Design a protein with these regions (language model features):
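Sec-dependent N-terminal signal peptides
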Residues: 4-14
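Beta-strand/loop edge motif enriched in small/polar residues
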Residues: 20-26, 32, 36-43, 48-50, ...
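Short acidic/proline- and small/hydrophobic-mixed sequence motifs that coincide with surface turns
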Residues: 50-52, 62-67
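Asparagine-centered strand-capping/turn motif at beta-strand->loop junctions
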Residues: 57-61
Length: 397
């Protein structure tokens, strides 16, 4: 009898264990929940320091979940993880019980006095669950600066409003500005940028002057305003497409950029009417736009005056004036010796239309292109294309 009871107990234990193992949620729709989608270490360090933050990972389902967790960065990452008590950069088959959670502790070590430390330190914790991938972003401030970190989103665009409606804001040169995501000047807002100010933009980020907003960049010959990527190592100084663009919509006043250096973007400046023309223009003077992976200057049905600028070494066009508009370009140098790939496009391109998703947008085009230098490594560096349904006038001399 005792032996029978022992066997019965053993069978019950095995059955209970087996039932538990079957209580696994393995459907393809599995999505974990997180206490935060981005962990920000927002302390500006003045000495070598470390700080730890906590991420809670929730299993919202009635069954247990197994997930793989790993840090995407290489072994030189500034971040380290402790996953539910285990120090590891990668851990597979981490079990999260039903309706329960685990803790991940994230640590960052920063030396802000090291000049080569990036302005922004970033990495990603990736979760792979039942074939689904989810990310939690890590962000730390590497050097002393003014950091602009998004607090809202529009579709896939994360942004922070730096000048709200009716607000005028001035950026000064005392400390650099670091943009993560997009910095937005809202409608009827105005951003002034003083001479000598440095703006570092993280990958895929940019500056957006929304319709009705206004940008005044007030650089000087001795102290230009610099826009560039946030990687400061020597290796990245000649790298293309480190950030996205300066995007300027129709302004409540003239947008003015004087003595600026805009480098290493995908598109240096994109000026376009988003809704309806307000009768104001973009004035670009004494500035340098260089090393854009796409276009240096792209305009769509805009009014632009450009004097004494250098636009150089772009992967597509240095200047593309499209979808109509009114343009004056005088005493500019366009130089294109882009060498990172094959460039099939001319350095300068004019058109009175623009096609998006097989839809043609067409407007009258007028351009005075006077006393400019155009040079490049392609046989043909200047091209025009137009539709006869709208006016096309190009005065080139």
């Amino acid at each position: 009898m005792k032996r029978f009871v022992s066997y019965l107990f053993l069978f019950s234990a095995i059955a209970f264990t087996s039932c538990n193992k079957l209580n696994i949620y393995d459907k393809k729709d599995a999505k974990l929940k997180f206490s935060s989608s981005i962990i920000t270490f927002d302390t500006i360090f003045t000495s070598v320091s470390s700080i730890t933050k906590r991420l809670v990972v929730y299993n919202p389902y009635s069954g247990d979940i197994n997930t793989d967790i790993y840090l995407l960065g290489d072994n030189n990452s500034y971040f380290s993880l402790n996953i539910n008590g285990v120090a590891a950069r990668k851990l597979t088959d981490v079990e999260i019980p039903a309706k329960d959670s685990i803790f991940i502790f994230v640590k960052v070590i920063i030396n802000p006095n090291q000049q080569n430390t990036p302005m922004l330190l970033t990495d990603t914790i990736r979760f792979f669950t039942n074939g689904n991938t989810q990310n939690v972003e890590l962000l730390a401030y590497g050097q002393d600066a003014n950091f602009i970190v998004p607090n809202r989103s529009l579709g896939n665009l994360s942004y922070f409003i730096v000048a709200g409606e009716g607000e005028e804001v001035t950026w000064t040169k005392e400390k650099p500005y670091v943009i993560y995501g997009y910095a937005v000047v809202d409608s009827v807002g105005k951003l002034n940028i003083e001479a000598g100010t440095k703006i570092y933009v993280h990958k895929k980020g940019g500056l957006w002057i929304y319709k009705g907003g206004c940008l005044h960049v007030n650089g000087t010959q001795d102290e230009p305003v610099v826009f560039q990527g946030d990687r400061l190592e020597d290796f990245f100084q000649d790298d293309y497409e480190q950030w996205d663009r300066i995007w300027i919509n129709e302004g409540s006043q003239d947008n003015i950029i004087n003595y600026a250096v805009i480098k290493n973007a995908f598109i240096g400046i994109q000026a376009e009417i988003l809704d309806k023309d307000m009768g104001n223009k973009l004035i670009l003077t004494n500035s340098i736009i260089k090393k854009s992976a796409g276009m240096g200057f792209l305009a769509k049905n805009y009014t632009v005056e450009a004097y004494n600028n250098i636009i150089a070494n772009c992967g597509q066009h240095c200047i593309a004036l499209t979808q109509g508009g009114t343009y004056t370009f005088i005493h500019n140098t366009i130089y294109n010796a882009y060498s990172l790939g094959t460039r099939a496009t001319p350095s300068v391109f004019f058109s009175n239309y623009y096609i998006v998703n097989n839809v043609m947008y067409l407007s009258d085009f007028h351009c005075d292109f006077i006393n400019n230098i155009v040079w490049g490594t392609n046989k043909r560096e200047f091209n025009c294309d137009y539709d006869k349904s709208a006016l096309f006038q190009a005065n080139i001399s």
